[in-house]
Amino acid sequence: MSAVVPPVSRADRDPRAGHPPAADRHRSTVAVRAGIDRDSAFGAVTPPLVLSSNFSFAGFDRKRTYDYTRSGNPTRDLLAEALAELEGGCGGVVTATGMAAISLVLHALLQPGDRLVVPHDGYGGSWRLFNALAAKGAFELDTVDLTDPDALAGALARRPAVVWIETPSNPLLRITDLHAVIDATHAAGAIAVVDNTFLSPALQQPITFGADVVVHSTTKYINGHSDVVGGAVVARRPELHERLGWWANCLGITGAPFDSFMTLRGLRTLDARLRVHQENTLAITGLLDGHPVVRALHYPGLPDHPGHTIAARQQSGFGAMLSVEIDGGERAVRAFLDGLRCFTLAESLGGVESLVAHPATMTHAAMSPDARAAAGIGDGLLRLSVGIEHVSDLLDDLSDALQRAALAGSRVPGIPR
């Protein structure tokens, strides 16, 4: 790679330019066939795992395709290639974690004095990094409600370099209109970055709406088995891809070959897993919606969700994440969580197993109480990542949890809620 950092050209911000998604194969086929039957040395059907940290030169000043695994690795490149094709981008960079992917984008696209616009209700880990770097003077930071056109217009009037979009948002599942926000971002001369972790390219492809960069925590649905951490960044244009690749190598945050191999294996079942994930989620919303102990249910697949129409237009499915606000105070929340059999209390999401998290004390604990309140993340909010267990078992587990919460949340004389 060149020792000179490639510049970000204005052409990178042209929403009309892009790399179309694979037209000759369905995305599910692209995911299954990633790297299949491409081993010319031995004819291995699945791609071999290349663990070597370095690669020999053919002779003096005769570098082969690869020289050092931090800079490039055949196994990791197969994953990057597959993700780029699934997203409709020109190329991808695989990183060690999802947070490394976010860090990569910030390093590659921003410099001191630039302004970054981020959603007020996004992932707590992203929020922590944005604020930590802004406090060190890495860039100026604006936190706004991207679903509010007036708030967005005000932020864009301050001429940001990058607008960060997260849709659906984590954990409240708010929907941002990709077409409208990306068009407005480009009109302001800024680069549009979309975190697509909650849906994966199986259900949403932001580049088709003009996004310049798409970010993933591949730990989640792309791998789907809660046994690997990783991240990825996909670029719409070659100039951005080159810049991201340069910075990934420079920072040393590229993904490990074994992790890439495992993620490739998980990717092959992405479409099949998501079908069951979503079927189970739909059944669970039927149980939760209107239940006396449920103060609010956040799921874009519900017709009365504020973002339902937009989600139906820009997504090919509503996903398997939902959040629910439990009535009855901390006692009710504790009772709901205590005794769960099929939902494990844990951070992360997107695995085959069902998980439940309490954002205020877990995924979004880094946010100040005021920031959580502004985002609508209350102490009674629970986030569910619905797995692929038998739906009857999941429904029974949640039904019992709701009953416990209802009993615990009942007012008892002399005992505060």
Q: Where do the language-model regions lie?
A:
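Short amphipathic alpha-helical segments
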Residues: 64, 90, 229, 263, ...
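Active-site beta-loop-alpha junctions enriched in small/polar residues
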Residues: 168, 197-199, 302, 327, ...
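Conserved N-terminal alpha-helix of the aminotransferase class I/II PLP-enzyme fold
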Residues: 54-103, 125-132
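Short loop segments at secondary-structure junctions
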Residues: 54-56, 235-240, 267, 326-331
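Conserved PLP-enzyme active-site core in the AAT-like
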Residues: 4-6, 18-21, 93-291, 413-416
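PLP-dependent enzyme catalytic core of the Aspartate aminotransferase-like
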Residues: 1-14, 131-132, 140, 154, ...
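N-terminal "arm"/small-domain region of PLP-dependent enzymes with the aminotransferase-like
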Residues: 2-73, 79-82
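Conserved C-terminal alpha-helix-loop-beta "cap" of PLP-dependent enzymes
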Residues: 296-382, 386, 399, 417
